[in-house]
Amino acid sequence: LYKERASEDYKKVVENALSDARNIEKLSNGLMDLAKASYNTEQISMSAIRLDEVLLDASAMVMKAHSGYNVDLRFEDDTEDDEMVTIRGNDYLLRTAFVNLIENNCKFSSDQSSTVQISFSKHKVLIRFSDTGIGIPEEDMEHLFEPFYRGRNRDFSQGNGIGMALVERIIKLHKGAISVYSHHDKGTVFTLIFDYLQSD
């Protein structure tokens, strides 16, 4: 009985150590990404990229990392027009931002799901990341994009307070806009707006 107990305790210590190591790695990667997103556009490699392809990659990464998460991607028919989903940007940074938004949707929703929709309006491409989760408390909204700020929902899920600050910096680096609408116990919607590339 003692040996079984000792084995269980040892296993728990190892699991906790691995969990701590993963959290430290995630924090370290987040800090490096935050620093990179603070560069100006001349310091970042930019090229023409399709947002729908980056979204597909991001959703696949999230579902591979979290088997219980579900991502529902919804594209308008006009997505077949390459120009309308193409912007000048950095593939890695945008994918990082999209992964953060999708994971946020999933981890704060009881059904662990995120709905991502691409739409278009007057040379703009809009991407909405929505969930039906617990929502963001009103008093936390003004601090949402502050680095290391963790709001009243911090006990609901683990995090380091870097994700939303990183997302905002990446979107601004791409000359985009980000807004958020949230309703208690009904969900949250993050909306990104970018200018798409137009032919000369």
Predicted regions and their residues:
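Conserved glycine-rich
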Residues: G176-A177
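Short alpha-helical segment of the dimerization/phosphotransfer core of two-component systems
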Residues: S19-I24
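Short conserved segment of the HATPase_c
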Residues: I136-F148
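Acidic ATP/Mg2+-coordinating residue in the GHKL
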Residues: D131
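Short helix-loop "hinge" at the ATP-lid/N-box region of the Bergerat-fold HATPase_c
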Residues: N105-C106
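Conserved micro-motifs of the catalytic ATP-binding
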Residues: Y39-I44, D82-G89
